[in-house]
Design a protein with these regions (language model features):
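Peripheral docking tails and interdomain loops at the edges
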Residues: 131-169
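Structural alpha-beta junctions
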Residues: 121-126, 142-146
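Conserved binding/catalytic microenvironments
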Residues: 1-122
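General small-molecule cofactor/ligand-binding pocket signal
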Residues: 78-80, 127, 146-148
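Short, hydrophobic beta-strand segments that form beta-sheet elements in well-ordered domains
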Residues: 101-103, 125-132
């Protein structure tokens, strides 16, 4: 419910620049609540998920909400945040060796940039989501990537990604 409202606020600033303040306020209220959901969901024997927004993506609430869904689904999540450089994502994937990497983008340009030069994520399954990735043709996505249509479908995609890679968690 909240993310579509934030998206409308974010798009409405073109007509009313005052809406930017409302979007920033709402973001600052929601961010710590979503982080608390992640902090309370650590499970030692759980499958692991690395979550980030790609380089150039300033909006983080979508991917943070997706990380919270992953945690609620049973994943132990490491959240890297917005504007994550490709090299940092690669290093994190090499170090943490997650079962799934979750990347979300609101903007088409950050999503397109990620797809044009995807990071080496090792054996991790890749799940992408958000309006930026939704706007791209399926053949523009990195090989093997799964696209989550919305947060409601995300837990199914995460489960399918685990099953496709033979990870039992």
């Amino acid at each position: 419910v909240v993310l579509p409202v934030l998206r409308d606020l974010g798009e409405g600033w073109r007509e009313d620049p005052g809406l930017i303040a409302a979007e920033h306020f709402a973001t600052n209220v929601l961010r710590p609540r979503l982080h608390r959901l992640l902090a309370g969901a650590h499970r030692a024997a759980a499958p692991t998920c690395l979550a980030a927004a790609p380089e150039g993506e300033d909006h983080e609430l979508g991917v943070l909400a997706a990380a919270a869904v992953a945690a609620d689904t049973g994943f132990r999540v490491t959240y890297l945040g917005s504007r994550t450089p490709r090299a940092a994502l690669e290093r994190s994937a090499a170090t943490l060796r997650p079962d799934v990497v979750l990347v979300g983008a609101v903007g088409v340009d950050p999503a397109r940039g990620f797809c044009a030069d995807p990071p080496d994520l090792g054996a991790a399954a890749l799940v992408v989501g958000g309006p930026g990735f939704a706007a791209l043709d399926a053949d523009a996505l990195p090989a093997g990537a799964r696209r989550a249509g919305d947060l409601a479908a995300l837990s199914r995609e995460l489960g399918a990604a685990l099953g496709a890679d033979g990870v039992t968690g």
